[in-house]
Amino acid sequence: MNSNIKNILIIGIGPMGLSHFESFYNSQKSYNIDLCDLSIKKIKKKYKKQKNIHRLKFFKTIPKNNNYDLAIISTNSKERYRIIKKLLKFNKVANLILEKFLFNRIKEYSDFQKIIKTYPKLRMINVNTWGNHILKKTGIRLTQNFIASYHLGNKGFATNLIHICDLFNELIKNEDFEILSNNISKIKSKRFGYDEISGRLMLKSSNGVLKIIDNSKSKYHILRLYDKKNSYTLQLNNKKKCHLFKNKKLIKTFDFPMARIFTENFFTRSLNKNVSKNYNFDNYKKISYLSQKILLFFKSKFKRFDLT
């Protein structure tokens, strides 16, 4: 591999993996990109003949004996730990981006932590969640005892919970919180072999609460926030944009962090030593904690629950 060009590996080329890939593929910078998927023939057929500035390689199994500046794992959650373990055993990786939901077994979190300790060359582990990023973009500062509601659009309830917990965690400044439920039931996810829920959830801390409401009629998510001074409404991913209203007046519009646009820029910024330390690149520790909180909650409600 050319040492002057960043080497990227993407494992799992479903919708999210493809979005990550296209972020690099559409860049004006040149990259060495390895793509790995069980259905790699279809992907290879689509991209091999297209003219581009990148070096592309296609693999059905995880490649070995390579040095990667970045590896993105966008497989299903059930197989993610096994794939990461094999990847790090046979390759040198500087940075990892992991899709959510991280792992579906509590033991895999502790096992992965052991791997991290024996793999000191990993400088960044990022989990692709957008709650923290979006809230920081808004610049919202709330007084204590706020009340919030999160209205889901026609997207999955459980599958978006990690994003919402990430957002709430930022609102309450990393304080601990409870996940409470009201008449929730398990239903089948649109993704085969995984679960979803219907009902209502609430996140509760000492200084605020957030009610999560399934509103399938809406085409986008809506966050409503109230404290003693102001009210805020945030439309999320409304035609790839976020619109923030303060006391019913539009005050800010910014891009929703779509992987197709965001990933390559995110990686480039993470390498820049001058970028503010407040930018949440290495968020694995926090998202791992939130993921386990969510997983334990569902395990307490249902005999078996598999998150995607």
PLM-predicted stretches and their roles:
Residues M1, S30, L70-I73, T268-T308:
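C-terminal helix-rich "cap/oligomerization" subdomain common to oxidoreductases
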Residues S189, Y194-E196, N207-R269, N278-N280:
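NAD(P)-dinucleotide binding in Rossmann-like oxidoreductases
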Residues S149-Y220, K285:
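Rossmann-like dinucleotide-binding domain that binds NAD(P)(H)
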Residues I62, L70-I73, N95-L98, L102-A158, ...:
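A contiguous active-site-proximal alpha/beta segment in oxidoreductase catalytic domains
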Residues M1-Q50:
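N-terminal Rossmann-like dinucleotide-binding module
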Residues G14-M16, N76-E79, L102-F103, T129-H133, ...:
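Short beta->alpha connector loops
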Residues I40-K46, R105-E108, I134, Y220:
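Short, charged/polar "capping" segments at the starts of alpha-helices
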Residues H20, Q50-I97, F101-Q113:
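Beta-loop-alpha module in the N-terminal Rossmann-like domain of NAD(P)-dependent dehydrogenases
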